[in-house]
């Protein structure tokens, strides 16, 4: 989603500046053009050479502002060049300058000369962050619709205290940049209550053996991340997802088997505006189960199976007129015909059909491709892309077509 995009990064003078090295590296690796501006204080923590090496382009500081070697004023050139502007770490000092429209260095001049969306990622001591003056300056900026906040995390700070003030992690910054680039800063899902299921379920035979599938939950997590970034209130019901992190701001409920997911859905589905069933629920379970671990020699020669609850059918039957229900269909070969049949059979509003027999698609991968089919008979193909990009395209489709 960042390939070919022009991303300008302003680095403030805080110890968290080192994290921005990882952001610049990831952006470059994903095909973005990156330019970096350092304040004089930032250069005391990370050198311009570091960012020059990572971005494959000279990093700029205040000394460059006054050099007569640029064909146009540097702050004008950079401000007009950028598709998006990240300021991280945003210090209390830089925040105060921007909030009052000061223009006394390269970074502050470039902010005033730009017209693109600006993502603010603050980092500072908790007491500083909570000061009335700091919050007043922040609200002053956020009154301008092109400014967007990636709030600081809580945790151990460089001052050896615990509290709110840690710079957002590089992965969080990357996700938010991608969302802003895709939406232009529009929080077009604000006010929506979205319920998402993700991951596989596991139906245990004994204490260690189970019937399941290779789903990792990456697609559902991408849907949750992107919906939250677009302003939705997201609840995620997920099966086992290993150590994959739950996106910030998302309410999560962990389950193991289909029966537990059924109970969670019964509680949460009536509260949602949109319900997206992206979980890969195991279709069957052992008809008989054992406590403890069965010795290998005692395993049954045949294993009677029983169906698990048809969760999407249950949700469909209980769906209210204002609710939107989206299903997923993972298939090999012809993915469209079975998906259309499932759409009709389950009375869905939309179904997303994705292949499991194509390279870099399906379970466990970071990318995917799909065909979206809706109840009106319309269908749209999504070419191979990251699962996060696909998630944004699904939301865009629902907003525009349904």
Curated annotation (Swiss-Prot):
The keyword Transport does not apply. It comes from the Bacteria. It catalyses: N-[(R)-4-phosphopantothenoyl]-L-cysteine + H(+) = (R)-4'-phosphopantetheine + CO2; (R)-4'-phosphopantothenate + L-cysteine + CTP = N-[(R)-4-phosphopantothenoyl]-L-cysteine + CMP + diphosphate + H(+). CTP binds at residues 283, 293, 309-312, 328, 342, 346. Residues 1-193 are annotated as: Phosphopantothenoylcysteine decarboxylase. One of its GO terms (molecular function) is metal ion binding. Its EC number is 4.1.1.36, 6.3.2.5. Catalyzes two sequential steps in the biosynthesis of coenzyme A. In the first step cysteine is conjugated to 4'-phosphopantothenate to form 4-phosphopantothenoylcysteine. In the second step the latter compound is decarboxylated to form 4'-phosphopantotheine. This is Coenzyme A biosynthesis bifunctional protein CoaBC. It comes from Synechocystis sp. (strain ATCC 27184 / PCC 6803 / Kazusa). The lineage of its organism: Bacteria, Bacillati, Cyanobacteriota, Cyanophyceae, Synechococcales. The gene is coaBC.
